[in-house]
Amino acid sequence: MIYLVSHNKSLFKTDKYVEATMERAMSVLLPLKLCQLDSETQGLDCHTKDLLTIQLGNRDNQVVIDWTSITKEEKQIVKDYLESDRLFLGWNLMFDLTFLYVQGIYPKHIWDGMIVEQLLYLGYPASMREKSLKAAAWNYLNINIDKTVRGKIINDGLTTEVVIYAAG
């Protein structure tokens, strides 16, 4: 199930995700001790571009948080969750963490699959093994990840397609 936490109301109803309050989202997230972490941003530079969404969850449930629309109090709830003793998993989390640091959020327990992949292939020629999430999904799971939607968030906002991609 995909949950979207946003104060920007959708014009059209969809069966692809559920619009949820922060309280409902936290009821899904709080039981998790191991949680996936990802974000979507306006660009690559955390000092000049904005954090747009934070995605948290597991295989069964994904929560997409519209960072641009939630209240200061809701941001504090997300901060407290991310700074808890949970283990957060992701790919290339160094990128996501820089945007979180600018927001004053400092997760304590991080497991970055890209760093693990780099350590596994340390010393091998770089051309031997690409380190992207797309490459890892193909190498380990034989799954092709379509990243073309990622560029649409800046111009189109949180469309149904973008929410589903972010939760992916």
Descriptions of predicted regions:
Residues 20-33, 78-82:
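A short acidic-Thr-Gly-centered motif at the start of a beta-strand
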Residues 34-48:
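Short acidic, Gly/Ser-rich segments with clustered Asp/Glu that frequently serve as metal-coordination loops
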Residues 22-23, 37-40, 73-77:
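Short alpha-helical segments and helix-capping/turn motifs at coil-helix boundaries
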Residues 2-17, 45, 49, 53-168:
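Active-site-proximal helix-loop-helix substrate-binding element of RNase H-like nuclease domains
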